Amino acid sequence: MESSNYNKTPLIVIVGPTASGKTSLAINLAEIYGGEIICADSRTVYKDMDIGTAKPSYEDCQRVPHWGIDLVYPYEYFSAAEFKQYSLKKIEDIRSRNKIPFLVGGTGLYIDAIVFDYKFGNKSDVKKRTLLEKLTIEELWEYCSKNNIELPDNYNNKRYVIRCIEQGGINNSRKVEINNNIIVVGISTDRDNL
């Protein structure tokens, strides 16, 4: 691939149930086509949590570079928004080196955040939330109206309205269409074989 074409390099997303062969497929394809793997799993991001997390083996990492592993300690906060930010930078980095990025998982929210370009709002402010929770639903609607905050679809649910306020009105966070230049491969396996 020419370096001027790296933005045209697709993101290959491989999804499927546990033990369906996602990782082995990704490794084989990445070896053949010159790719690197970003693990989209909410457990593998944690350091020192190697048991029960299906982290790639040392041998797998030697065959193909893997990213998204051992990013934070278990006592540290790590959100889907942070995963999205990390992954987008990593995808850009992989493409800039004329490699193909593979996003493999795992955790649906992590995958969807990239594929559907989720817009994450601000982190919740405990003091502000406490004040908002004391208001009636009608007072929350009035607050939204005065502050040009579009009400969520479920505007009768106080919790949804409060979260919408915290996010500054970003409540339609999921696009219906997949982002451009993404190829999604879904693996299905007979339940008896799992």
Specify the residue positions occupied by each region the protein language model found:
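Phosphate/pyrophosphate-binding catalytic cores of soluble transferases and nucleic-acid-acting enzymes
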Residues: 1-194
